[in-house]
Amino acid sequence: MKEKRLLIKNKLGLHARAAAKIVTLTNKFTSNIEIKKGDKVADAKSIMKILMLAVSKGSEILITANGKDEVSAIHDLEKLIERNFDENE
């Protein structure tokens, strides 16, 4: 299992568009991928579960991946988040 702590820096946090980009990306992987904020955990392949985390700007999340492509999954998610979900702010 691989994990990575990341800070959400985009203005609107994990809103619908950002969550949709996460789901699109994570569905390319076979690994089980989760996002954790505080004591709440969401399946990163479910837009509704991601939105229920209510992740705002400045929040720290923990991404975990478990499976044969876990390293690639964590890497690609980290890059997406570092690019602020390709949003112009």
What are these model-predicted stretches?
Residues 56-89:
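C-terminal structural segments of small proteins and small subunits
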